């Protein structure tokens, strides 16, 4: 069964729209227009044009074969466009932004009639370009890369003559830092909206849809939850390109729905441990919002080669419903490392409770260079020592067995403030560690050790190195947005990171931390469980 992409409700806004008539050689485009709602998924690939993946082959094959996926309650199919940009473009608009230079931009669009209440479709994610993304989400803090779900108002443009599919003329412009451009990290000048003008194939060969508008997704972060579930594609693309050699490449299932959500992820814990604790106290104005952004990156190994990383982005939103004075919202972040030679003793369930503003996950491309962290001056992360050594970690998946094999896990927690919060400088809270992941053969109760991957070996040459894990992310009662570790009862005040210089963060007692632990042996999160 093909993954499904659903839009939970029709577009409720009329955006600024500029219909544009394109003119080709020997073809004059004059037509009438009618307004339609367009759910558009803009996918920006890596800025390095040399980075290519087999997914492009299938992407093109879908176009060449003129295949259309079934779209329920809709009268149009899925179109695509690709354009190589030789130089960077930029503009400044509103609060969503993407910058692209010297790479490929792919824009996919699902068009439905405006009178429909909603749209559900069964699509090949490769045709949507989801598996074609380089580092839209997975490269933590990489400026200029983004995967953004947009809602657009489009217009049908009926052409006078039949024409072939035209490349997209995108204007995905501006700088992007995963929404942290309002945190005083030097990205404020690059704030801009994602503005796209795309030629979208209509139901007839002589009809295209010109789309130009502003995305509305970022303005209302509590409307959608987008969740990834991995699967293995069961078909190649033909012509010797793409998935013939990489049938293990992950598929992506994207589910869009408003939800009171819960995210459960399995991680491993053993005896030796190290600890990171951070706490940031921020002030919110009335009707403001506090967003704790949890970014988890996993490098996935295929049979004998790198299959590509998986990026997971979760925004957890807590609104301030009313306050005469700015409300102090506490964000506590605890990270803990566990290592031991031997068997992994247990799994810790990590739960995120509360209203989830957005969770975006996407399968990324195979190039290991996509894991390079961008500007260390803007976002403080720990260098990835695993990238210099090609290790094999088998059948251990700290993100709930989304995919078969992983190499490393990186966790970054960012705390940011919404648009209407009290304007003041706040330092980003970033807790990140990179470590080898357990080399194990199974993850069913007891874990059999497969091989040594690093460090001193035991008598039998067996060793397990477990990736440093991260905290549960959860919203406590009241107006506190709390993140606490499932296996740690102690928060050390001396390790507390503060939101701004001179602001003394309140110490967190052991009793406070003891209320947040959660231990679970449940399986990976599903779209249905999160939707609940």
From Swiss-Prot:
Organism expressing this protein natively: Synechocystis sp. (strain PCC 6714) (Aphanocapsa sp. (strain PCC 6714))
Listed name of the protein: Phytoene dehydrogenase
Pathway given in the UniProt record: Carotenoid biosynthesis; lycopene biosynthesis
Domain of life assignment: Bacteria
Single GO BP term: carotenoid biosynthetic process
Chain segments carrying region Disordered: 497-532
Top enzyme category: oxidoreductase
Cofactor: NAD(+); NADP(+); FAD
